Amino acid sequence: MSVRISFVGKGGTGKTTLSAILIDFLIHKNKIPILAVDADPNFNLNELLGIEVETTLSEVRESLLKSDVPDFISRYEYTEMKVHQILVENKYFDLLVMGYPETSGCYCPVHSFLSTALEKLMRAYSYIVIDNEAGMEHISRLNLTEMEHLIIVSDASIRGIFTAGRIADLIKNLKIKAENIWLVVNLCPEDQKNELEKYAKEIIKEKKEIKFLGFLPQDTDLLKYELKKIPVFEWKSKLKSSAYELFEKLFD
C-alpha cells in the first residue's frame, strides 16, 4: 500500500517548494519509488525537480470527453494507456501533472475512467507526493481522498494560520480521509515565532484533528536557486535542512 502525503494551502505559501523538498528527502532516505502529482492548474513542480512537462492529465480528460478513442480499444484501456504516456519518468520518481480545470461539459464518466486508472497506477509506487491547489478540487473529483499525511502550509501571518483552520473544515466537507493532518508555518522570521505559535496553538485547540508540525525559516537562497533554475536536489539551504528535520516526524 502506498504512503500518500499531500500538501495544501493558499497560493504563495510554499506548497510546491515543500513538495519538492519532500521528494528529495524520500530519495535521500531510499524511500522509493515515488510518484509526484502536481494537482495545481498553475503547475511548476517540474521546474523545482529539473524536468520538463509536455502533456497533462487535462488533455487526456478532454480527449475522452470528445470521444477521441480509437475503435479497436476500450475507453478504459485508452485512458490507462494515455495516463502512462503522460508520466514524466525519472530514475527515482515519476511525475504526473493534472493540468487545467474542466471546461463546460459532463465529466462524470470521464472522472470514473480516470480515477480507476490513477488508482491502478498508484499501486506501483511506495510513496505518493501530491502538490495540491488550494481548493483540492482535482483530488476530490478523482476520488484520491485517502492519505496518510495531509500537510496544511501557512505563511508566517495570523491570517494564514486562521486560513489553515478553514482548510481543515474544507477537508471534512470534501470527505477527505487523512490519518494525520499537520500544520506547518513556512518562511517564518525568527523573531515572530513566539507570537505566531500562540495562534497556531489556538487553531489546534479548536480543530483537534490538526497537529503542529513546526516552523520553517525564511531563506534568502531560494530566490538565487529559482533565478538560476537549480533543481531542489542541488540545494544547500537552511530551509531544506529544516524541512528535513520536520519530515523525519512523519516517518518515526
Residue ranges and their predicted role:
Residues 4-41:
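Walker A/P-loop phosphate-binding motif and the immediately C-terminal alpha-helix
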Residues 41-42, 101-103, 134-135, 157-159, ...:
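Conserved nucleotide-binding/hydrolysis micro-motifs of P-loop NTPases
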Residues 133, 147-165, 190-192:
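Conserved Switch II/interswitch segment of TRAFAC-class P-loop GTPases
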Residues 28-90:
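N-terminal phosphate/diphosphate-binding loop that engages ATP/GTP or pyrophosphate donors
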Residues 172-252:
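C-terminal lobe/tail of nucleotide-utilizing enzymes
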